[in-house]
Amino acid sequence: MPSEMILRLLDEMARYKLNRFHWHLVDGGGWRFPSEKYPLLTKKAAYRMEKDWDTFWQKDRKFVDEQTPGAYGGYYTKDEIRRVISHATKLGITVIPEIELPGHSNELFFAYPELSCKGKWTFDASDVCIGKESTFRFFEDILDEVIQLFPSKYIHIGGDEAAMNHWGSCTDCQRRMKEEGLKDNHELQSYMIKRIERYLLSKGRKLLGWDEILMGGLAPEATVMSWRGEEGGITAARAGHDVIMTPGSHVYLDFYQRESEGEPRANGGFTTLEKVYSYNPEPTALTPEEHKHILGAQANLWTEYVLDARHAEYMLFPRLLALSEVVWSPQATRSYSDFLARVNYHVPRLQERGINVYPLRRIAVDMQLDSTRREVSIHLSSERQPSEIRYTTDGTEPTATSQLYLGKPIVSADSILLVARLFDGAKPLDLPSVRYRTDYHKAIGKKVTYNGHTWNEKYPAGGTQALVDGLRGTPTYLDGKWQGFTTPLDVMIDLGEVTELKHVFARFMQERMQWVYMPGDVEVLLSEDGETFRSVGKQVTRTSEEEYKPVFETFSFPMKERARYIRLKAANARSAGHFIFTDEIVVW
C-alpha cells in the first residue's frame, strides 16, 4: 500500500483510539523493506509482471528487475518509513515492523538463492535454510537495519506457515539438527526463533511472532500473536507469555463483509461487521491472573486481493470501528444494536473525510424450520439504519410496489427464491439485492448416517443434520452453512418410509486458493431396506482443478423412483489435506 494511504489510516486509527500499527514488510509476494547491505532485495524481489495474485502464485512466482517496463510492485524508501513512524508517534501510535522467517521467503531466494536449502530458487521453496550460518548473518544484518529505523520495543519475526518441505533432505539442516539434538522440523524452527530472540534481546528489543512459534518449544520471552483461533493464545498465556489475539475467525478484514455477489474480490472468508463486534479477546478459559497476559486484539488486512488504497479502505472501514469498541469496552456493556445506530452515524463522516467506506449494505437472512408445520420462516435485517427492505418470493427484482418487510417472518412451505433489496422510499438504493433459495424438501429433519468418515472438525456446519437442515450456503465456505470434508463424503438419508422420488441434488464449491476443490465425481444410490443399494447415476465434475476463481456446481439427479434410503457419495479430487464442501442434499 502507498505510504500516503498509511498516513491517512494512522489518522483514522488515532481518531478511533487504535494505538498499534503492525507493518508486514516482506512476504512471498514481494520484498518491501529497503536494505543498504542487501540491495538485490529491492532490485530483484520487489517487482513482478502479474498484478493479479492468483495468476502470479499459480503461474510461476517469479520476479523481475526493478526497471522492467510494465512491472507491478515497489518498496518503501527509508524516508517514507521515517515519515510514517514520525506521524504515528505524534498520534500516539506505535509502528511494529515484521520481517518474515523462516517461511514466506519465496521472494528472498530470487535475490539471494544461497539462503535456500537447495542454493537456488525453485517454485516450491519458501523456507530459509536453518543449517547455514549465512542465514543467521543475513537476518541479523536485516534486523539491525530495521532496529535503526523502528523504535518499537517489539520486532515481529513471523514464524508462521513454514512448509518445512526441504529441511528433511537438506544436509545443512540435518547436520544442524544432529549437532543441536533436535528431533523434528518443529524443533529446528524453534531453534531459529530462539536464536533470533537472543539477538533481539541483545539489542534491547522483544520478539513477537505468530502462534506457530509455540511448536517445538516457545522462545523464553516471546510474545505470541494468536491467529489460528484462540488456542495458541490460551496456551501461551497459561505459560506466562504475553499474547495478542487476532483470530482469523473474527478479525481478518481481507475476508468478505457481505455475500460476495457485487463485492470486490476478497480472500474467500466471511467476516461481517456484527461478527467483528461479537469478538471477546479475553477467553473464558483463562483465569483472571492469566487474562493479564492478553495485551489486546488486532485486525489484519492481507492485501493479496486488495488492488489499491481505495480498496483497502473499503475492507477496513467500518469494521475497524467495531474492533475499537471490542478492545475498549467490556463485553458486558456492549450492544450491537446500539453500536449499529452509532456506526451508521459515522459512515457519512468517514466519507466526508475522503475514506472509501463500505456503505453498510448487507441484508442478513435468518431462516428457521418448523418441523411440525413443515414450513420455513425467513427473517430479514439490515446493517443500514434507517432503511426499508422490499422483497419478492418469485425470483423477480423488487420494485417500489413490492412487499415491504415489517419484521414479521416470511413463511413458506414451497420452494421459493427470495429476492430482497434496500429502498429509500420509492427509490432503490444503488446496492445489490440479496438472493436466497429455500424450500422444505423431503429430506429436511430426516436421520442422516455418515459412512466411514464424518466432517472435518473445523467445518461442522450444523453437525449431523447440516446437510438436511434446509440452510443453503452463501458464496463463502466460512458462513457456518457449508460442511467440509478432507475425506470422501458418504452419507445415507433415511426418509422413514418408502417415498416417491423425483429429484436429488447437491451443490459443491471450489475455492482453490483455500484448498477447496470439487469432488471428482458424485453418485446417488437408492435402497428400500438400507442394505442393498442401486445406483441411479454418477456425475463427473465439470470444473477444472486449475480453475482458481470461486466456482459452484450442482450435481443434479432427476428420477422416477421409490425408495426409503438415499445414499450420496462424493469422491475427493485431490490428495489428503484438501477439502470438499457441500451445503445441502435436496430431495424432492
How would you label these PLM feature ranges?
Residues 1-19, 419-420, 433-442, 452, ...:
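Mature N-terminal, pre-catalytic/accessory segment of carbohydrate-active enzymes
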Residues 1-2, 28-34, 102-108, 156, ...:
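Flexible loop/turn segments at secondary-structure boundaries
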Residues 1-205:
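Substrate-binding cleft of carbohydrate-active enzyme catalytic domains
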Residues 207-212, 217-222, 228-377:
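Flexible, acidic glycine-rich loops studded with aromatic residues
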Residues 330, 334, 340-490, 509:
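Short, compositionally stereotyped local motifs that mark structural "simplifiers"
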Residues 397-403, 531-538:
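Surface-exposed loop/edge segments in extracytoplasmic proteins
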Residues 473-537, 549-588:
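Aromatic, loop-rich ligand-recognition surfaces of beta-strand-rich domains
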